Each structure stands twice: as C-alpha cells, then as structure tokens.
C-alpha cells in the first residue's frame, strides 16, 4: 500500500541505501522524511553484518534493537557482538548499549556502553594475541567509551611476557575534517621500538582534495613529552603530505606517488630538522595468485633523537612479491636495500594463514633474526 510518500510492506522487503542492504518484514518507510522501521531485519550496514529484532531507519543513522553484529560471513560466526541497542552512523562510528562480546558460544567480556570508530578499521573490538622476539608472547585489547557526540575516552591495553604491562590511555575528538587526540602511556612502532608519551597532543587533518587536481593532502601536528630508557624530550613533529591518485598504466600495472615536508623539533638537544620526503611504488598483478612490486623511499635527513617511528633508511629501494597458494595460504617476500651505503638492509619473509574469520601473520626478519606472529580478526 502507498499513501503520499509512504509505503507499508507486510511481507519480506529489501531496503537498499548507499551503505545499507537489509531484508526484513513489516516494513514502513517514508520517502519524504527518509525514516522508517523494519522487523526481523538482516543484512549489511556499512561493513557490519547485522541481525536485529527491529531496526529504525533514519536519514543519518540506523538503530538496531536486540541486535547482533559481526564481520564474519559464516552462518555461525566465529565472533560477534550482541547488544540491547546499537546505533550505527555508517562510515563514522557505532555505539552499542549493554554489549556482549562473543567468541563462538562464550562471552569473553561485556560493556554497558561501547563505542567504535568506523573511519579507520585498524582497531578491533576483539583481543589480538601474538609473539615477538623482543617482547615475548602478548595479548592486546583496545577499548573506547563515548563521552559526547564526537568525544571518546580510550584505553589500549597490552600485556607482554617480557615487557610486562604496557597500557596507553587518552581522549579523542573526531570532527568532520580532523581529529584531536590526547594520549598518555606506552606506544610501540612496527619495529618493536617503545616510547612513553607523558602526554602527547596530536592534530590530524584528514585527507582533502587539492582543488580539482588528482591530488590529496593531509597534515599532522604533534606536541608532547617523549621518554625512552635514557632520555626525555618535548617533541614536536609537523608533516604536510601530498598523495597522487593511483595511476593505472594498464589493467594490471599501477603507479603510486607521494611527497611531503616534515619538521621535527626536540627540547632535549635543541635540534630542529626539516626534511623532504618522497615515496613511489609500482605494482604489477601477473595473475590472481601472483603479484610483484618495486618501490623507492627518499628521506632527506633521517637522523632523529628517538628511534621510535624513525626512518631506518634514507634512500631505500624496495622490491618484493606475494604468492597465494590457495584460499588459505599466502606467502610474501620483500627486500629493503640501502642505496646510500650499497647494502641489503633487511629481508622480510611473511606467511599469511586464513583461519576462517581470523588471520594469522608470521614474519621473519632475516638480518635481525627476529620473529613475530599475531592472530587477529580478518579485515573483510
């Protein structure tokens, strides 16, 4: 039945929006106000697979009542979240009330209120476990709690068999065009190097187009007290970076380029460094299973007071490949070559193992003789 801009469908109906595709019954929707309801709904909201007793359809958000969420496509998910109510702003954030976090049929923890950013998908609501030669076995968990419309408190908790408890805490304000973050605690980079921020204030201006050009730019500003095992310094870091849209040289060949300028200042020794950066890479897909790539990274001055997040090689040539044996196993190799000193800096060997809705990554750095592996939820 229809009346003006409204529809009522008692039988099964499919609601499709740019970021939503759900099927349910007893659907009522008003095209004028872009509001409606649906019972026994199931489908996709953003990248979340959802099931709900009923769902409210609103112009800027969707509200699930007695809902379940997961990214696992299995009929019986390996992990999921259930909640009395979930409010999802697609591409922005979600807030779940009386949330329970399940692995298979076991509740591993619960939260009265839980928030997750959907802008960056690098933070999982489920624990990550792993091992590294430097820190031993570890378990990490990221948690976030809303304090206002755009403000949240967060805790990034990690326990390591060698390094022990390494927590970090803070607050983040996510606005439309930028993020403001205050962080305090222990942070680790991809080379297992630690720093303590006491505290750090960070401004991230999100990617924006440069006029009508095929170029985007970002800006990051950092000010805070950094401490390692031997020194402390009030650290300042400002970087403006431009990224060219990928250039498709052919259906299987893609060129990427980016450049920027960074200024780093330290109170410890009064240093101030200005550095030009340039990065480019060429990716070739030979088949659905095999691809190769080569890259070049240039940093004008890579001398820094702290090793944390520092650039290891000023003039670096990279080349490598990935090969997918089957849907479960992929291997990768790449080499970092120091052009300035004419030497191999490092060889990286990686094995990716698909564990259904989880992924294991095992990496060995041959020159440093360092091993690390982790298991985390698969990013679908």
Q: What are these regions, as identified by a protein language model?
A:
Residues 1-177, 181-195, 202, 227-236, ...:
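Structural signature for solvent-exposed beta-strand/loop edge elements and short helix-capping sites
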Residues 2, 40, 173, 184, ...:
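Surface-exposed beta-strand edges and flanking loops
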Residues 60, 90-91, 176, 208, ...:
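Residue-level marker of positions within ordered structural domains that often coincide
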Residues 147-151, 174-179, 208-217, 245-255, ...:
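Short loop/turn motifs that connect adjacent beta-strands in outer-membrane beta-barrel proteins
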Residues 181-275, 279, 283:
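Transmembrane beta-strand segments of outer-membrane beta-barrel domains in Gram-negative
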Residues 349-359, 363-380:
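Outer-membrane beta-barrel "beta-signal"
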């Amino acid at each position: 039945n229809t009346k003006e801009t409204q529809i009522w469908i008692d039988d099964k109906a499919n609601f499709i929006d740019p970021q939503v595709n759900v099927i349910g019954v007893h659907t009522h929707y008003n095209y004028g106000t872009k509001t409606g309801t649906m019972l026994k709904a199931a489908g996709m909201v953003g990248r979340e697979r959802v099931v709900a007793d009923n769902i409210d359809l609103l112009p800027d958000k969707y509200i699930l009542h007695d809902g379940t969420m997961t990214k696992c496509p299995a009929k019986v998910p390996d992990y999921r979240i259930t909640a009395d109510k979930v409010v999802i702003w697609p591409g922005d954030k979600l807030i779940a009330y009386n949330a329970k976090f399940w692995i298979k049929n076991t509740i591993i923890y619960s939260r009265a209120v839980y928030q997750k950013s959907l802008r960056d998908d690098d933070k999982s609501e489920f624990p990550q476990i792993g091992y590294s030669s430097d820190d031993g076995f570890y378990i990490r968990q990221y948690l976030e709690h809303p304090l206002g419309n755009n403000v949240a408190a967060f805790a990034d908790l990690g326990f390591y068999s060698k390094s022990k408890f390494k927590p970090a805490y803070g607050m983040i304000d996510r606005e439309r065009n930028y993020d403001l973050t205050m962080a305090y605690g222990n942070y680790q980079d991809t080379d297992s190097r630690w720093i303590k921020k006491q505290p750090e204030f960070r401004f991230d201006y999100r990617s924006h187009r440069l006029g009508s050009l095929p170029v985007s730019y970002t800006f990051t500003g950092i000010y805070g007290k950094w401490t390692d095992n031997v020194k402390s310094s009030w650290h300042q870091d400002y970087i403006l970076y431009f990224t060219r849209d990928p250039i498709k040289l052919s259906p299987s060949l893609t060129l990427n380029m980016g450049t920027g300028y960074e200024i780093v200042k330290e109170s410890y020794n009064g240093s101030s460094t200005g550095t030009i950066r340039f990065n480019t890479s060429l990716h070739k897909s030979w088949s659905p299973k095999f691809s190769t790539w080569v890259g070049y990274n240039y940093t004008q001055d890579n001398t820094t007071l702290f090793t944390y997040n520092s650039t290891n090689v000023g003039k670096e040539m990279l080349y490598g490949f990935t090969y997918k044996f089957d849907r479960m196993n992929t291997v990768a190799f790449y080499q970092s070559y120091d052009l300035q000193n004419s030497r191999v800096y490092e060889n990286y060997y990686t094995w990716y193992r698909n564990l259904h809705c989880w992924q294991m990554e095992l990496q060995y750095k041959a020159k440093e003789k360092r091993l690390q592996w982790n298991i985390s939820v698969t990013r679908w």
